[in-house]
Amino acid sequence: MKFSSQAGQDEFLLQNFFRGRRGGVFVDVGAYDGEKHSNSLFFERDMGWRGLCVEPLPSAHARLVAVRRSINEQVCVADFEGEAEFIESDAGGEERTLSGLADRLDPRHLERLDRLGAKRTVHRVPVTRLQTLLERHGLYAIDYCSIDVQGAELSILKDLDLDRFKVSVFTIGNEYDDPRLGELMRAKGYVFVMTIAKDQVFRRVDFPALPLTSVLCAVWHQDTQRSDRLRGHAANLAAQSVPVEPIYVFDGSDAPPEWLSGRKIVAHERLTIYQAWNLALALASTPFVMNLNLDDRLAPDAIATLQILLMREQAAMVGGDWKICYSQAETDAVEPCYSAGGLPFVPQWPPAPGTTTRLGSGTGSRGTYGPAVMWRLDAHVGAPRYTWRLPEGTALKVAGDTAWWTVVTEHLKRKAVRFPGIIGNYHSHPATQAEFRQDVDELALIAQLGLSLL
């Protein structure tokens, strides 16, 4: 598969909403030349979708017609019919994609063009409403609509009857973070999913998103607090901004509670954490996987953030950092992802009393750098394993997280990246913290493990 979006929008949409969806329908408003940073090209070329591309620039439209099988309209979309002045910007490179209707461009956008030294050419172009185009071509049921027109998005959407024209998923350019866009989409029956670059993703409230990531969790029979921790864990996953597939492994013949959703495995024997996680992998059916201890909590946007990084960077693995917490109540009070720069990396353990720190990791026999790790499921193919046998003789090939960074980067020659952010809270205790190693410099460790620092 060859994706063409600027920041992984097309792969995100495929994996989260349209896996296996062939023969769908798209609308691309502001399609430019149909190739450069196109959000719709992949769906037309690789998934057999049909649709409508709209582009007012004559030079870009000529290329669009040459490379795309879609219906291609050379017109500007707004909330009225007629003609208007359209500013074509040219600062070289890709800056023509910053062109737009003169009376809809944000003043900050014009300042940006000035800073770029962009040459401006004013064209008189035909203008039409989006629903006029949809009516003309009989497009009433639309899987995906991309609107990126440098400032006219809000007026176009205000004018569009979304009860008459059923659109499952939108990506909408919001270059300057106008809060009115989210308010409008909620009022029209859409749920905000996430922002990718400057595109905001919305899905229709009755259109389900597909889980892209399986989250593996071991539930220990000997943990006397497992019931409360399990409820907190399940609630934390349910609060993620994108859906996930939970997979729980219970050992010691412990029965899962009836209220627990997700996939469950019960093992009769006691398991190590690596045995439990790798047993859970047998049930994983999503492209991405991550582990999450029963007492740890993810930021509400953590799964979405790590997913888009994997897709944008075309990496096999991404790691982030945790905030160290010393009580379950503190751990449960999780915040959205934020920069790791505000918390120190402390290689020595324990830290000084009262120190708020983040979880680094080391190179000893246990632990990996970036303990909050999401990886592509296919990264397990060809990875070294050691064998663990179930009592009935079934052999499982398992891999602990000891070698994962070096296995992925050196043995499999795959790309691994580190997100320099706090993606959740890690429940720990100074006397038992295992992931810290003595005298490990953070940047040296990143270099040693072959990571790309984002």
State the predicted function of each range.
Residues 115-121, 343, 348-375:
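A recurrent flexible, glycine/aromatic-enriched loop bordering the glycosyltransferase active site
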Residues 323-325, 329-330, 419-437:
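Active-site donor/metal-binding and catalytic loop motifs
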Residues 289:
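Short aromatic/hydrophobic "clamp" motif used to bind/position activated sugar donors
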Residues 268-283:
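Glycine-rich, basic loop-to-helix element that forms the pyrophosphate-binding segment
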Residues 303-338:
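Conserved donor NDP-sugar-binding/catalytic core segment of glycosyltransferases
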Residues 395-404:
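Acidic donor-binding loop at a coil-to-helix junction in glycosyltransferase catalytic cores
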Residues 1-211:
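Phosphate/nucleotide-binding beta-alpha loop and adjacent structural elements of enzyme active sites
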Residues 232-244:
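Short, acidic, metal-binding catalytic loop of nucleotide-sugar glycosyltransferases
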